[in-house]
Regions:
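Active-site and adjacent substrate-binding regions of carbohydrate-active enzymes
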Residues: 1-185
């Protein structure tokens, strides 16, 4: 897993996020080192859905970390509407995007990623629900009121409801991609 790989290549005057072609050249160098050892690269990045970074990763032949799934499942379970979750699953299939999907991780529950797939009001509702259950909003790069993720275990985010957790896990396991089970979910 290559955390925040898109920030690695730096150039004066550039955005310094997914600089192209530098990011892909760096990944190719790492891949050449890793392949003789049978290692696969898993580029990890948080970015809004609307940026389509996951598509760029897939176009380069890499598996991508699915940071959309955790929030989409919570949204579906809390709203009773799985339209966005089903749409995401169909997009993975239609575009042949290979993912490792997860529910929880050491970073908490990613929400910045949902911009462009869920309306801002729905994202805010998710934030409010998770915060009401003990979650803590982590702002983007220390900027106030620009959310990045909510720090909470997935079980806590679901209100410690065992039925919701079981359904969330089943959805994760049967989603396109390889499920990653985190020990603190």
């Amino acid at each position: 897993r290559l955390d925040a790989f898109a920030y690695a290549p730096k150039k004066p005057g550039e955005r310094n996020f997914l600089n192209q072609p530098d990011t892909w050249e760096l990944l190719d160098k790492i891949k050449q080192i890793a392949e003789p050892y049978g290692m696969a690269l898993l580029p990890e990045i948080h970015e809004s859905y609307s940026e389509k970074i996951y598509e760029k990763i897939a176009e380069q032949g890499y598996v991508t970390y699915d940071f959309f799934l955790p929030g989409l499942i919570i949204d579906a379970l809390e709203s009773g509407n799985g339209e966005h979750l089903a749409g995401w699953a169909q997009e993975l299939i239609d575009k042949n995007i290979r993912t490792v999907n997860m529910l929880g991780c050491h970073d908490g529950i990613p929400l910045l990623d949902l911009k462009g797939i869920l309306a801002e009001e729905r994202i805010q509702k998710l934030i409010d629900i998770i915060v009401s259950r003990g979650g803590y909003v982590k702002d983007l790069h220390g900027q106030k009121n620009i959310y990045y993720q909510v720090n909470a275990t997935y079980f806590s985010a679901l209100g410690e409801d065992e039925r919701k957790m079981l359904l969330a896990r089943a959805l994760q396991i049967f989603m396109p991609g390889k499920p990653q089970i985190w020990y603190l979910d």
